[in-house]
């Protein structure tokens, strides 16, 4: 999987950037995503996170991670509006699945609050957002149980334990 990483803050250590790429590639293998899959991750500060959270979620505060899932639109590729294509074909034509915005301020706060390493927190946020992009959610107790168990399984197997 290809992950484009952007550090808008200029403060994220190169080790965290590499770890983020690696843990997302690891998670992609766990979900059996194609190697051609692409996504982006942008590290932002709380001010930018607040702005994005307001824009996309209509929530007036900063947040730790924002996940924007991308679904290819048939109209981008074909002129015949009546033509329906299998989702697999659309995914092959446009392998971009979404983007994450991770707040470095929230990552630092939460690592301290939860008493684990900053590496673990960045990994947690990246995998959490990645799972959202891939259809997982936590609106119900059942969804939360499934998503958080998978998230913990990925992080533990990768080596980011508490």
UniProtKB/Swiss-Prot annotation:
Enzyme Commission no: 3.1.-.-
Protein name listed in UniProt: Endoribonuclease YbeY
GO molecular function: metalloendopeptidase activity; RNA endonuclease activity; zinc ion binding
Protein species of origin: Lactococcus lactis subsp. cremoris (strain MG1363)
Predominant place of localization: cytoplasm
EC main group: hydrolase
Residues where Zn(2+) binds: 128, 132, 138
General function of this protein: Single strand-specific metallo-endoribonuclease involved in late-stage 70S ribosome quality control and in maturation of the 3' terminus of the 16S rRNA.
A biological process from GO: rRNA processing
């Amino acid at each position: 999987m290809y992950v484009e990483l952007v550090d808008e803050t200029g403060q994220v250590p190169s080790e965290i950037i590499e770890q983020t790429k690696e843990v997302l590639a690891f998670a992609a293998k766990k979900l059996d995503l194609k190697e051609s899959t692409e996504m982006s991750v942008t590290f932002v500060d709380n001010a930018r996170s607040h702005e994005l959270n307001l824009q996309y979620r209509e929530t007036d505060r900063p947040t730790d991670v924002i996940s924007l899932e991308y679904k290819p639109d048939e109209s981008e590729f074909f002129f015949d509006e009546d033509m329906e294509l299998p989702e697999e074909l659309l995914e092959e034509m446009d392998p971009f699945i979404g983007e994450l915005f991770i707040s470095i301020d929230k990552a630092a706060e939460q690592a301290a609050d939860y008493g684990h390493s900053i590496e673990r927190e960045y990994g947690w946020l990246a995998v959490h957002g990645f799972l959202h992009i891939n259809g997982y959610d936590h609106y119900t107790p059942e969804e939360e149980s499934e998503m958080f168990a998978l998230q913990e399984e990925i992080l533990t197997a990768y080596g980011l334990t508490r």
